[in-house]
Amino acid sequence: MEEEFVSGQKYDEIEISKYGKKSNKAKEEKNKYKQAFISIIISSILILILFIFIHSKIKTNHLTEEFQSKSQSKLNEKDAISDKDKLNEIALKSKLRIYPLAQYFLKRTNYALLNIFNLIKIKKEDIDINRFILALNKTIYNHPVLLSRFYEEDDGEIYIEYRPDLPPEIKIIKIKDEDIPNLKDNLLHIYKPFNSSLVNFTIFLSDDYLYFFYDIFHSNFDGNSVIIFKNNLEAAYLNKTLPKDYFFLNLYNYNQNLKSEKYKSTVNFYKENFDLTRDYCPKFDEDIPENIKNNKSLQLIYKEYSSEELRQQLRKYFGEKPKYYNIFMTMNILLANYIYSDFKDENPTAKIGFNGRNWTIDSNSVGCLIYNYPVIYHFENKVVNIKTFYNKIKELFELKPKLMKYPFEHTERYSSMMSIIQTKGFFSSEFAGKKLELIYFYDNLINMKSNYLMTPLMEELFIDDNITKYSSFFDAKFYKKSSADRFMDIQIKTSKLIMENFDVDKDINLENLF
């Protein structure tokens, strides 16, 4: 405003020189009105400035409160990502203590890692081999955990360190097609986790085919299962953007909060409740024929039931929250195990894999149970209070998100166990032009070599508006078909029992029902 006032003065001087001198009285009269006019203008401006200041202050306070009430994700996306990437760089330079569940898993396997491996077959004419190798390297370097090493300190704690200077070897070997079936036993080996690579990649080239063998340290705490890996490998081959992996940042944040009471209580829960020397697998049939026990291939007995009533009840109690469907499935397994043991196993255990990633009811596969996360419940006197039972399992589940965070930032939906069991669609037709042949996958032989048995019971739940299916897979090595049939019959009854008494606070005598 000051600059405009000066311009006005200059304009007045021009007017005077143009029309000649005026009388002193006229000048004084003019100056009087001029000063009055200027005073009014200045006063108006000051009032306007004051009004704007007060209004902006009120608005700023309102925006501050609104900003504080919003999550960090509502900030400027570019700046937020930049800050997260900077923190991730710091995390990658740190030696970090791994989650209690991962420590449990490593120690329980006697320091031998149970891995899930795959060997796939692709026609050479359907793939650019050099491009495939470049995509493989890009995928590896996109996931820091694949370039990391584990270390055990004197205090017994296990740490992980990012070591890009020690990349995994990618072996390329020429081979004859007829020799592929004989590779299986040679490829299987025990991973000694400390100061050694956590992955094994080999490309076998015959005259007509490329055989790709990939074996990756597999545990639900690191987010790098073979299913995620193959999806990212496919994206890299197609020159698509790969999701950022914030595994180390999540682990860094966990380490930063280790001294807080919240984390202390969670860590102590693991130490107090999970016996590293205990085998949490359910009891097996003792009279399985030796030829089945010693068979090296994975054989499954598949059982399934569908129920419209179950679908309605699940939606009634859990709505659109898939995590609560896992609670139901866990309750069902624990209760069925207790009854299956003729009420002798009062502390049955379910091992929960939490394999569904970012899924919703709409993606159909809302629950998968496998072997990693032991959930224990104590039954006694052949009775159960369903309401108390639910609240306890829910409480145990609430601990899980504090320790295990899915590291990738994307919206794709994964159901790892289904992909593994069905063994279909390992790469899209866009990847290689034609369907690939899966030679073999996941074998119990590696469990035997590492002195560790996968829980031979896998469960899945599918639900949508048209159908609900509850499926179980029993390992034929440890269950006779008659035993699997009995277990499934019990599960059908227990699922109905849980749903019918979900909000009933009373003891139910199980002996009278089973």
Residues covered by each model-derived region:
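Short amphipathic alpha-helices and their capping loops
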Residues: 67, 74-111, 133-178, 197, ...
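Active-site-proximal acidic secondary-structure segment that organizes catalysis
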Residues: 202-249, 483-498
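Acyl activation and transfer enzymes in specialized metabolism, enriched
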Residues: 93, 99, 123-147, 214-231, ...
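Flexible, non-catalytic linker and terminal segments flanking ANL/adenylate-forming cores
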Residues: 64-103, 162, 288, 398, ...
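His-Asp-centered acyl/peptidyl-transfer active-site segments
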Residues: 85, 107-116, 133, 144-146, ...
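A short, small/polar-residue-rich loop/turn motif at beta-strand boundaries
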Residues: 88, 125-141, 157-196, 226, ...
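Acyl/amide activation-and-transfer machinery of modular secondary-metabolite enzymes
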Residues: 100-123, 155-175, 195-200, 209-211, ...
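Extended, hydrophobic beta-loop-alpha segments that form or line the acyl/peptidyl-thioester binding
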Residues: 143, 147, 224-233, 346-353, ...
